[in-house]
Every structure is written in C-alpha cells, then in structure tokens.
C-alpha cells in the first residue's frame, strides 16, 4: 500500500495494569492515541475511529438431499456488545471537490487522543476458537482528498472477571465410579475409582491436588490417569457444535490385579489457558478434570469433575484489594505481549484472520473412539500471542461414553 507522505499510522492504548497489556473489563474506560507521522504537509478530510466488540460463530455441515445430491449448510450467529464511532479530525464529508473543511497537517509526528466507555453489562472474555471468536478492536481511518484511505486495526483484550473466592467455586468436587469387566461368560471383579479435589475454581498456573483411590479387582493390568479438558460449544440457528481439547494430563503407576493405588494430593498443573466463558449466548468455554482408569481392551472407567478457570486468584487469608485490574495482572502470563497492530489494504477492510484461513491452517483430525486415544493427541501449544494463531489440533470425543455404575464390592479373596 502506497502511503505517500504518511509515514506511519499507529494506535496505542493507555493500559490499566502493570503488565503494559491493554486489558479491560465491563464499565472500564478505554483510552489511547492515534499516532500519525507524516513526511510533508498533507490535507485531511477526516481521521476517524471505530471501536467494536462482538462474538461470532461460523461452521459448515454437508447435507445429503438424496439422488446423489449434496449441499453445504452454513451456520452463523453474531452478538454485538458495543459499537462506538468518533471523528478526531474533520467531519463526515464525501465531496472531494470542495476545498472547504479540509485540515492541513504539517510534517512531523502528531497524536490524537480518543476515549470511550465499555458497557456496564457483562462482556464475554476475548477468545479465539475453532468455530468462533470473541474480539474487541479499535480501527483508525485517515481520509484524504483524491486518495484511498489509510486504515489500521488494533485489538484489545476484555476479561469478564471470574472471582474464584466465591462459595460455589470454593466447594470440593468429588465422585465415585465402578466398572465390571465381562468376557463371554466369564465375569471378573470390579474396578473402582474415587476422586476428590479441594475446590471447583482455579486460575492458570495453579496446580490441582488430586486425592484418589483406585482399586483393581479385575484380572487385567490397569493404569490410573488424569487430564484437564477444555470444551468449546458454539451455538447458531438452534444447532450446537462442540469441540473438546486436551490441555494437561498425568499418568499414575500401573496397577496389577488385586492392587490398590492411592493419590494423596497428586499435582496436575493448569497451563496458561483462556478463562471460562459462561455468559455468552453463542460461545461457551468450560473445563473439566477427568480422572480415569485406562483398561486394555475395554472402555476406560471415567470420572469427570467440573472446573471453572477464573481470573481473580484465591486469597486464603481474605486479603482483597479494590482494583480488579491489579488482581487480573497476577494471572495474566497467558497474554504475555500486547496484541499487534494490523494495517489493512484499502479500500475495504479484510478480517484479520478469516474463518477460511483458520480452516486452511488446520490439519484434519479424526474423531477418537476412546479416551486414551484422545490423550495421545497433541497438547495445547500455547505461546505468546495466542489469539491470532491457528487453533491447535482438536480431538472430538464422545462426551457421554458408555459407563456402568454399581455398588462397590470388595475384591474377592485370592
């Protein structure tokens, strides 16, 4: 793109936290500057900003219409959270012939401040998923007579804060499952699993203490394991698309027939993942801890405990500060760097990352028939500017595998 005498057009935000990352919450004031550097005198019709926040989902499904006829069904939905426009220089004008109303900008660097308030109503946390995203951005447009406009778009991050210091998220989570293996007319003893964690809410970087007891009364060698899964759900036109993604796992010791293993606070660390999204009508992001027993030649014995990944960490002694932004900075390692500025080619603005581009960057992944196959899949490769990377490989697994639950007998004597 030829800019002529316009050397650069950039956007900078006034950050509210010590991490120097533009992160905001509902009700915050977003302020910053549009920075313009020119190498000579230019005439300007207007310098505008457009700020917008929205959630959007999109996926396609192939349908069979019969008689060897197939078609593609598109599912799309969008929720807008805010839409703000302002003119920093000049005014709305489409007439290039009139000399009136043009502003002259001299050679050098110039700053133009902008400011707007985010809605007080809850906003969805910024997110980039396989079939949808939640994005917030500011776009600057410099309009000059007889020239194509210079446009630039820069994103900022919004957190809908989740404070894990609430009674519902501090409550312990526990469960028990049992499975009896059958082979033709021979029935072996049961395999039983009990697991408990101290609370439901955690923040990225914390380690979950897992307390579990696994009793193997079967004739097979089994292996106890645990994993954290992220579930992304996308909603459009009355349909739902769900994707499950493995984010962390651990493996216990092999357990022979008649043996019992106890986990007394076995640690599983939560990697730098996106917080839970629970208040968006078209995108939902949830987490769960799967404690399970890998059984060769049979379906795994699986126990699922719900998790909520929050943004405000645990305060065991009740020491709270009034600044939510300062609390947020304690758990923001997953953001690392500010989101980059993204210039666009005139005359129209293209999406930073289109859905088609994301699909082209995805390697095909078949559905997993067994939980263990999913665990052997790729882990979440999380690096600095996570929101504009192609999504990682996903494993779509049955959220309700065939399991049995019976009263727990003791192992038979041998």
Curated annotation (Swiss-Prot):
Function: Adapter protein that plays a role in regulating cell-surface expression of adrenergic receptors and probably also other G protein-coupled receptors. Plays a role in NEDD4-mediated ubiquitination and endocytosis af activated ADRB2 and subsequent ADRB2 degradation. May recruit NEDD4 to ADRB2. Alternatively, may function as adapter protein that does not play a major role in recruiting NEDD4 to ADRB2, but rather plays a role in a targeting ADRB2 to endosomes.
Tissue/organ expression: Detected in visceral fat, subcutaneous fat, brown fat and skeletal muscle, and at lower levels in kidney.
One Pfam assignment: Arrestin_C
Domain of life from the UniProt record: Eukaryota
Gene encoding the protein: Arrdc3
Reported induction: Up-regulated by fasting. Transiently up-regulated during the differentiation of pre-adipocytes.
Family the entry assigns: Belongs to the arrestin family.
Protein name: Arrestin domain-containing protein 3
Keywords carried by this UniProt record: Cell membrane, Cytoplasm, Endosome, Lysosome, Membrane, Repeat
């Amino acid at each position: 793109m030829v800019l002529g005498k316009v050397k650069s057009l950039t956007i900078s935000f006034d950050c509210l936290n010590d991490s120097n990352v533009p992160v905001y919450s509902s009700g915050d004031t977003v302020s910053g500057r549009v920075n313009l550097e020119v190498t000579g005198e230019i005439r300007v019709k207007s310098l505008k900003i457009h700020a917008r926040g929205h959630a959007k989902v999109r996926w396609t499904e192939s349908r069979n219409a019969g008689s060897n006829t197939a078609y593609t069904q598109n599912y799309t939905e969008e929720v807008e959270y805010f839409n703000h426009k302002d003119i920093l220089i000049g005014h709305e004008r489409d007439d290039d012939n009139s000399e009136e109303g043009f502003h002259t900008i001299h050679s050098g660097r110039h700053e133009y401040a902008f400011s707007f308030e985010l809605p007080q109503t809850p906003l969805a946390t910024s997110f980039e998923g396989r079939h949808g995203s939640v994005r917030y951005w500011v776009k600057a447009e410099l309009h000059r007579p007889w020239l194509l406009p210079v446009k630039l778009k820069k994103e900022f991050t919004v957190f809908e804060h989740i404070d894990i210091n609430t009674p519902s998220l501090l409550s312990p989570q526990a469960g028990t499952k049992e499975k009896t293996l059958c082979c033709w007319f021979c029935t072996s003893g049961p395999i039983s699993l009990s697991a408990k964690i101290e609370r439901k809410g955690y923040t990225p970087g914390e380690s979950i203490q897992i307390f579990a007891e696994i009793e193997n009364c079967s004739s097979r060698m089994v292996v106890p394991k645990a994993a954290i899964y992220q579930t992304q759900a996308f909603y459009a036109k009355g349909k739902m698309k769900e994707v499950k993604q493995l984010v962390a796992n651990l493996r216990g010791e092999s357990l022979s027939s008649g043996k019992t293993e106890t986990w007394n606070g076995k640690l599983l660390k939560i990697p730098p993942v996106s917080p839970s999204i629970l208040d968006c009508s078209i995108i939902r992001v949830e987490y769960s801890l799967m404690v399970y027993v890998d059984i060769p030649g049979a379906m795994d014995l699986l126990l699922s405990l719900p998790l909520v990944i929050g943004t405000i960490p645990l305060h065991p002694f009740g020491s709270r500060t009034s600044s939510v932004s300062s609390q947020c900075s304690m758990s923001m390692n997953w953001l690392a760097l500010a989101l980059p500025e993204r210039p666009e080619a005139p005359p129209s603005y293209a999406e930073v990352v289109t859905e088609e581009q994301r699909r082209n960057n995805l390697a095909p992944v078949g559905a997993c028939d067994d939980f263990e196959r999913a665990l052997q899949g790729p882990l979440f490769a999380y690096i600095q500017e996570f929101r504009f990377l192609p999504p990682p490989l996903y494993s779509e697994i049955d959220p309700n595998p065939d399991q049995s639950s019976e009263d727990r007998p003791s192992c038979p004597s041998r």
